[in-house]
């Protein structure tokens, strides 16, 4: 018999592979950081031995979820400004609060708290854009989470850098510092067309090309932005991106609410990736992204929560439920966004958006061992006829029982194993006191 590091025995395994393999009374064998084999419990009891056996009975076992767009450290700003339009929210509340409060300490503890929230709701990989991203990388590494992240680039000063050139230099340092890390990858991340000059966008694109990494930005989040960009640029957003050489397979575009039919065809032809953020777009009344049309055209679309200041949580199960239902009611068509499609957006398609589809997002031999166990032995999850329906319309993040990332168990029976959750919450409560005091100052 072959010895492996960990055996998961029993339960329903959803592989989310090319054939959407489903195995009842399934099993996983883990060797080091990777999946050695996927099969049945009966087969594996005869084939493998392990000192670490996890009982998967009454569990749903699937790839860890991929949060394709968030701002992790903004857990520290959860609920400080709600019920207002995007530009008012950003310009009069979020940017001033960040200018007064964001420092390495806030970003580290806020990001670590986000990791706690994400792991406990089944997310194993996330894509982050924020300030002092070295601290987010450090927090993710401590938590044991997989991530793609980048320092947000602006034309104007941020709490971390004074000029666009400093921001690009900081990004270059991140690319060097985290090169080859097993969990942390770096992207180049200009904030948006309305906060970045053509020259900054061009240099960002050149840096992404030099290192062959993704370039991620917010794009056409609402109709006001679309109108503003037309006036500022004298052309539409995608024409500008095309002129700058940014429309290619490395582009990850967040939101994409105002893509028209021609834009969608361009995304398809150029291989650009998109991220759907329905709850944030609803809360800020930004509009409806044309997600069904993008999917029909074969565009790779992931699912993201956005940050805690505009959602206000990081639970991708809740996001899946909203994503499915919102598109149905928008078009008055219950067949749109079927559950299986939405689960793929939150797993294998999300991994593809981030350029990690050879690493995570599905369960098969050779892939990194990023997976979750959902406890089905609960009243609201009994009985189960269709596991994909369950995942989208019934499961809550709190139903996640056990989480593995890169072959390591990071949560067991709802208890985090890689860091002190209580200490993290205490630190964020302390930071929140100075944030609260700063909000009393006039803008």
From Swiss-Prot:
Substrate binds at residues 98, 191, 221, 306. Catalyzes the deamination of 5-methylthioadenosine and S-adenosyl-L-homocysteine into 5-methylthioinosine and S-inosyl-L-homocysteine, respectively. Is also able to deaminate adenosine. It is an enzyme of class 3 (hydrolase). It comes from the Bacteria. Zn(2+) binds at residues 69, 71, 218, 306. CDD domains: ATZ_TRZ_like. Belongs to the metallo-dependent hydrolases superfamily. MTA/SAH deaminase family. It catalyses: S-adenosyl-L-homocysteine + H2O + H(+) = S-inosyl-L-homocysteine + NH4(+); S-methyl-5'-thioadenosine + H2O + H(+) = S-methyl-5'-thioinosine + NH4(+). Pfam families: Amidohydro_1. One of its GO terms (molecular function) is S-adenosylhomocysteine deaminase activity. Binds 1 zinc ion per subunit. This is 5-methylthioadenosine/S-adenosylhomocysteine deaminase 1. It comes from Syntrophus aciditrophicus (strain SB). Keywords: Hydrolase, Metal-binding, Zinc. Its cofactor is Zn(2+). Its EC number is 3.5.4.28, 3.5.4.31.
């Amino acid at each position: 018999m072959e010895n492996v590091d960990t055996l998961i025995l029993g339960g329903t395994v959803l592989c989310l592979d090319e054939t959407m393999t489903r195995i009842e009374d399934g099993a996983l064998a883990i060797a080091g950081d990777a999946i050695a084999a996927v099969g049945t419990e009966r087969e594996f009891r005869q084939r493998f031995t392990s000192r670490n056996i996890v009982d998967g009975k009454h569990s749903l076992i699937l790839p860890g979820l991929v949060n394709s767009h968030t701002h992790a450290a903004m857990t520290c700003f959860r609920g400080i400004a709600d019920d207002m339009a995007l530009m008012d929210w950003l310009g009069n509340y979020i940017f001033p609060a960040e200018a007064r409060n964001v420092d390495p300490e806030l970003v580290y503890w806020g990001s670590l708290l986000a990791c706690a929230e994400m792991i406990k709701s089944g997310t194993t990989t996330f894509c982050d854009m924020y300030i002092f991203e070295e601290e987010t990388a450090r927090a993710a590494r401590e938590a044991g989470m997989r991530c793609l992240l980048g320092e947000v680039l602006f034309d104007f000063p941020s709490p971390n850098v004074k000029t666009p050139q400093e921001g690009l230099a900081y990004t270059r340092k991140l690319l060097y510092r985290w090169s080859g890390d097993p969990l942390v990858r770096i992207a180049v991340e200009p904030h948006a067309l309305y906060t970045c000059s053509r020259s900054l966008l061009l240099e960002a694109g050149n840096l992404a090309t030099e290192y062959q990494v993704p370039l991620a930005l917010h794009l056409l989040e609402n109709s006001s932005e679309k109108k503003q960009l037309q006036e500022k640029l004298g052309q539409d957003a995608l024409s500008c991106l095309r002129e700058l050489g940014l429309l290619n397979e490395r582009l990850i575009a967040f939101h994409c609410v105002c893509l028209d039919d021609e834009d969608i065809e361009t995304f398809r032809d150029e291989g650009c990736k998109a991220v759907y953020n329905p709850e944030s777009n609803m809360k800020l009344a930004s509009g409806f992204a044309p997600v069904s049309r993008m999917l029909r055209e074969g565009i790779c679309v992931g699912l993201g929560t956005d940050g805690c200041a505009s959602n206000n949580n990081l639970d991708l199960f809740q996001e899946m439920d909203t994503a499915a239902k919102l598109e149905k009611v928008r078009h008055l068509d219950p067949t749109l966004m079927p559950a299986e499609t939405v689960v793929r957006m939150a797993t294998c398609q999300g991994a593809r958006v981030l350029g990690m589809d050879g690493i995570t997002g599905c369960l098969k031999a050779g892939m990194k061992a990023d997976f979750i166990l959902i406890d089905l032995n609960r009243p609201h999850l009994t009985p189960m006829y269709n596991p994909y329906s369950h995942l989208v319309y019934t499961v809550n993040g709190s139903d996640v029982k056990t989480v593995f990332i890169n072959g390591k168990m990071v949560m067991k029976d709802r208890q985090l194993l890689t860091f002190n959750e209580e200490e993290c919450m205490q630190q964020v409560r302390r930071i929140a006191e100075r944030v609260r005091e700063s909000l009393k100052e006039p803008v």
